[in-house]
Amino acid sequence: MERTAIYAGSFDPVTNGHLDILKRGLKLFDRIIVAILINPNKQYLFSVEERISMLEEVTKEIPNTEIDTFSGLLVDYAEQKQAHAILRGMRAVSDFEYEFQLALMNRRLNREVQTVFLMTGLRWIFTSSSIIKEAARFGGNIHGMVPELVERRIDKKMKDTGLYIPPKNNKKQKG
């Protein structure tokens, strides 16, 4: 029986931390479905199509990975895909309480689906999509935190949408 897990998230954008969890998860599972959550109540930087495109591109060399989208309950999606596990990455203790509550609710909704937590590698422990977007917005260097393709797309999106705010010159003016 193939061991399939669902790795769900918004992936807005995908980070090197996400890819770290995915690669390490493949040591535990035969196949991982990276499932992009479609939440109409949330505002995203990238469209679903853009997120699918980025994920497909950055995972093309990672075997046994499938990119998909879902809405609704994650455990229902897992059952539909015949997956028996949900893979979750945790950066810090602060993630644990929320993730633990989600895991308990998912377990209550479907006892056949287990949640597996992986700690993010130390190199990525501070990395989140939100922090990366905020840094990029103000001209911060995000090189190495996201794949190069994603870095270019963030830069372009920030400039094309007017979200980019150039750093201010901190030199005192004479006068």
UniProtKB/Swiss-Prot annotation:
Homohexamer. SUPFAM superfamilies: Nucleotidylyl transferase. Keywords: ATP-binding, Coenzyme A biosynthesis, Cytoplasm, Magnesium, Nucleotide-binding, Nucleotidyltransferase, Transferase. The gene is coaD. This is Phosphopantetheine adenylyltransferase. InterPro entries: Cyt_trans-like (IPR004821), PPAT (IPR001980), Rossmann-like_a/b/a_fold (IPR014729). Its EC number is 2.7.7.3. Gene3D superfamilies: HUPs. Substrate binds at S10, K42, L74, R88. It is found in: Cytoplasm.
